[in-house]
Amino acid sequence: MSDNSEVQGIHPVELSVYSLVSSDLDNLYQAINELRESQALLILKLRTVRDSLRLENELLFDSNEYKAQFKEVNNLQKRLQKITLRLKDLERRSSQLTTSS
């Protein structure tokens, strides 16, 4: 007994399995598509947040704004070191004068 599906090359068992599994496959395909859509939305949201954080970081931590202040602090530190050395030298001389008198 030859079936119409056998003539087309599809075995009846194969057709039965497909009919049983096809609804699950359709649901799985739909779920995968929904996941892809939500993934795309999440990527867009993450990019928006990343760009916002980059902009905020640039505004808060603009290194050009602080370069002059850092340079001034470094200059003050160097001056302080020189003054400290001079003070030590003067203290040493003073102690020599007091001990020799």
From Swiss-Prot:
In the UniProt record, which is one GO cellular component term? BLOC-1 complex
Q: Which GO terms describe its biological process?
A: endosome organization; regulation of protein localization
> Is Transport given among the entry's keywords?
yes
Give the keywords, sorted.
Answer: Coiled coil, Endosome, Transport
- Which ranges of the sequence are coiled-coil? 62-100
Annotated localization = Endosome
Q: Which protein family is it in?
A: Belongs to the SNAPIN family.
Query: How the protein assembles, per its UniProt entry?
Result: Component of the biogenesis of lysosome-related organelles complex-1 (BLOC-1).
Q: State the function annotated in the UniProt record.
A: Component of the biogenesis of lysosome-related organelles complex-1 (BLOC-1), a complex involved in endosomal cargo sorting.
Q: What is this protein called?
A: Biogenesis of lysosome-related organelles complex 1 subunit SNN1
